[in-house]
């Protein structure tokens, strides 16, 4: 299964990272930084209109390479000028061709809140995310299970907000036990990467009133947006739909306008 492969590679990668830079060194480095410019990710989702999280994504297991040029600074410049509310940056190296450096640069070039999008399997990555400049991290229930509460508390203790990601009702039940501020409903099944937009509709009615809800994955056409906007959600995460238009500023602005206008 794809998710098992990703997690396996991530754990091996972390063994090397920890040898190169132990967790203690990261914590010590964090303690020496006087001030972090943390931006309010949840605040960016609380709007009268639907909020848009634009994702910077070079590749994916299902689509392969999405952007062969991947002129990162140009992408950041475009995202800064677009009418979007936050940015998600893929840092997973092997399957999504991301880099930690992309997160650091995005925080430098973009004034909007920045999410580190990766497959967090170890508390090391939570502290690392803070050091890289993330405002929020993604915690995937299917990966973390009983460790979800622990990782959520660690992130909160160092000033990071979390998107707690679920795909089905059993995962949502686990998530709701920790009363998260933000829940992401992934329309993509991480076991086989198939997509069903009905997933958001199936889970939305179980959400607590004060929880910000994001619909993730598979939102590409005007009909998709019209359908998703009919649901009581706060925001959408759009990756491929933006990245395929990223170098055509007029086209991408029309695309964003169509999402906002519904």
UniProtKB/Swiss-Prot annotation:
Short name of any one Pfam family annotated for the protein: IGPS
Top-level lineage group:
Bacteria
The pathway it acts in is: Amino-acid biosynthesis; L-tryptophan biosynthesis; L-tryptophan from chorismate: step 4/5
Q: Which Gene3D superfamilies match?
A: Aldolase class I
Which EC numbers does the record give? 4.1.1.48
Which EC class, in a word?
lyase
Catalysed reaction(s)? 1-(2-carboxyphenylamino)-1-deoxy-D-ribulose 5-phosphate + H(+) = (1S,2R)-1-C-(indol-3-yl)glycerol 3-phosphate + CO2 + H2O
One Gene Ontology MF term: phosphoribosylanthranilate isomerase activity
* InterPro entries for this protein: Aldolase_TIM (IPR013785), Indole-3-glycerol_P_synth (IPR045186), Indole-3-glycerol_P_synth_dom (IPR013798), Indole-3-GlycerolPSynthase_CS (IPR001468), RibuloseP-bd_barrel (IPR011060)
What Gene Ontology terms for biological process does this UniProt record contain? L-tryptophan biosynthetic process
UniProt keywords, alphabetically: Amino-acid biosynthesis, Aromatic amino acid biosynthesis, Decarboxylase, Lyase, Tryptophan biosynthesis
For whether the record's keyword set contains RNA-binding, the answer is no
Q: Which family does it belong to?
A: Belongs to the TrpC family.
Q: What is this protein called?
A: Indole-3-glycerol phosphate synthase
